[in-house]
Amino acid sequence: MLISIAFLLVLYLLNYSSFRMLKSFLTLKKISQYAYLWFFILLSIGEAAFVFYRNIMPSHLFVLTSACSFVSFIIFILSLSFYGFSYSIEKIDFLHSRRKSLKNFLKLGFYLALLGYFWRGFYEGLARPKIKETPIYLDKLDKELKIILLTDMHVGSLLQKDFVDYIVEEVNQKEVDMVLIGGDLVDESIEKVKSFLLPLNNLKSTHGTFYVPGNHEYYHGIEPILSFLDTLNLTILGNECVHLGGINLCGVYDYFARKRQNFAPDIDKALKKRNESKPTILLAHQPKQIRSLKESHSVDLVLSGHTHAGQIFPFSLLVKLAQTYLHGLYKHSPTTQIYVSSGAGYWGIPLRFLAPSEIAYLRLLPKNQA
């Protein structure tokens, strides 16, 4: 609750600051000031509704209210940038003669930047995810292994069966050895999305489909979600390890549940039955799960999602602070690499900016082929 209140206060501070800056550099008339004031009041009401009632509100209201915080942040960043330009115009002497024309240009630039940001954001957000290929070299690997990593599909009120059908069709074209689903598959109660998930039964690969939950599965009822997914043509890796394709494939429950008694992540348990002569891959939804690894765990590769690559720049800067690894392939230690997918779907409104979605196609190769 305290974190929620703190988050809301930060949003209110952003809204207040944005209003003051807009009022200053746009030199708003009285009627325009009232219009902007009511806009920020409505924005703040939407943010309060989201913070306190997001888990019980209808899906269309969830999408609408979740958009409010995105809008606040974007307007604040643009307002701060253009306020800085406006301040410079006032302070730089040789610009005084052109001050009026420059300020008019600045006003136009602000509205164009705002329009362009949202146009590009919705364009990227609504675009279908493309397959992104990445080679990864591993010690102890005998032969090439082709993997599809799907994360953050967020199947729910906006991303439905047609989206899952598209994903399955794209994946099946690659003829891979295994498909890994790295959490946040579901973003509604399972009763609302059962029919949307059925196409997952059609995923094709040599060794099958494997899944670990993300934090959103816990939000919407982890037990009924796992019970339903257990009826599909996939294997749930809940702190478990399987041996196939010349590797140890291990999976853990999500970091979000680390203080729960049930469905909590347990890396020691997940890795207990691994074959140490083979490379070990750990499927964990959040990248920061890697902080729990010890050198003795001997994990060669961690596969994660969760970050959406920030989804909306400059949110990515905040996400990187929380998760360390944002998107792509990183070397965590001399013996451990981590790949973080930007995700196939989106959370909240269909908006992505400088963070395109992806279907990660990972080609694991013996290190001697590097």
Curated annotation (Swiss-Prot):
It comes from Helicobacter pylori (strain ATCC 700392 / 26695). This is Uncharacterized metallophosphoesterase HP_1044. Its EC number is 3.1.-.-. One of its GO terms (molecular function) is metal ion binding. Its cofactor is a divalent metal cation. The keyword Metal-binding applies. Binds 2 divalent metal cations. Keywords: Hydrolase, Metal-binding. It comes from the Bacteria.
